[in-house]
């Protein structure tokens, strides 16, 4: 007899069957993979009991090495050994070369200005390199868990933009792995601590990794993780501490032009010194030169602190801005969570504690907390915990909008809006008979397009040729849970539509985002004045165009004196419209409107006469 398995739609017929999914912290310096096993989330070690994997890839003439093997050869073969590739994701070659000094790589530019690394295996891009880091982590997970993965959650800095997020997803796609979600690193940390402690209130997530810094202010309430505000710097991390010490030691030893191998060796030594100073008051730095000479120098904790103080203070300034954005005072923060290996630096903990007024939480290993949170989220998304009521609400770092006539920005989705989100706004045509409309999608807080960042352009065709202002075009902005944007424009009467997914060729650094926010505040008064001027100039152009068309059609209804008076008022508006005086333009528009009142009445009377011509009183 045949047996039928019956299950609820969308659920497995075997409820006990555990689906395999993992969380991956794809870090700048190190990467980790974690999974939920027997209800407990933890990172997965390799066969040598090492939990982390160095985010390093080496390309040789015989193959590709990743992780510890690549790290072992990085000093001897720096040109073919790519470290901290996360810092290059979604950035142009020009940005990289201007922002990061002393890079040993042989760069080439792709057709759209993105960086290519020339290696023994040919040219490779950051997406391909990131894929090589993911590969051993996924292999480790599948061998440990005993099966193929149904999906992964990858963590990214909260301030990663569309290009950086898409590049991260593409790295997994190269391996044929399904990405269940890109999860902001601070949010992942909140998941790990929130589920462990069950606390409710405002929490600050201070995430200082190898190459990026993020501060997120979250409200935890009944299973809801709402990000109130975010901030940070995608080009500031522990690597920068290493580079400062590296530069200081070169000066101490009077080395002006080190070879690539010596420079890489010293960078590795600088990192070791930094780590030792976490527990010791001083350590001796050592460097072996190409001629066999060994150099030494004692580095004290106070010296190291003096080198990095300005950078750590920059992170505290970001915390202050994030709190202001969230409308929260430092003493209202319930807990501060430290994330990232660089938070082990004593000066970092000291300044963070001083700012928030309380000792930060460190009960979960700061190196592993993000991966653990990602594993918990992966376990939920793959369907192993259908009863979970955990809800994540991330936010947009910058406003998204559309260019309107006069180079103005109409914001559709505001900064700090929770995502995923879909918002729509209606626009209309500017000219009679207009059958197409060009859309310019921009990002930023300023009032004029020239001061914002261009994201994409697309055109909607097939609009019915109606009078200006008669067509209704609904523009919908949709940002998914990964922070990727799609924009759709639809003409409501016909249903004709056009859309675009925004994948900019390269992204903004968090320093640039912070600069944009500061510029918007510093120029707010001037921007409003410029916007008012532009709005009046657009209105003047619209009035003149509409009136010119009316005169061409019904000018015979006017006497010569009446027409002359209107044309004189039009000439005044044309002259004033070219000036930078919004009030004068507004007054000229009002004067022209007053001079055309009789003309408008005559046109209305004439239209009624034409409509009633030939009809009897009884038929009306």
From Swiss-Prot:
Keyword Metal-binding: no
Domain of life: Bacteria
InterPro entries (UniProt xref): ATPase_NBD, Heat_shock_70_CS, HSP70_C_sf, HSP70_peptide-bd_sf, Hsp_70_fam, ISC_FeS_clus_asmbl_HscA
UniProtKB keywords: ATP-binding, Chaperone, Nucleotide-binding
SUPFAM superfamilies, A to Z: Actin-like ATPase domain, Heat shock protein 70kD (HSP70), C-terminal subdomain, Heat shock protein 70kD (HSP70), peptide-binding domain
GO MF term list: ATP binding; ATP hydrolysis activity; ATP-dependent protein folding chaperone; unfolded protein binding
Pfam family, one: HSP70
GO biological process annotation, one example: iron-sulfur cluster assembly
Coiled coil: none
Keyword Ribonucleoprotein attributed: no
Family annotation (NCBIfam families): HscA, PRK05183.1
Protein purpose: Chaperone involved in the maturation of iron-sulfur cluster-containing proteins. Has a low intrinsic ATPase activity which is markedly stimulated by HscB.
Protein family membership: Belongs to the heat shock protein 70 family.
The protein's name: Chaperone protein HscA homolog
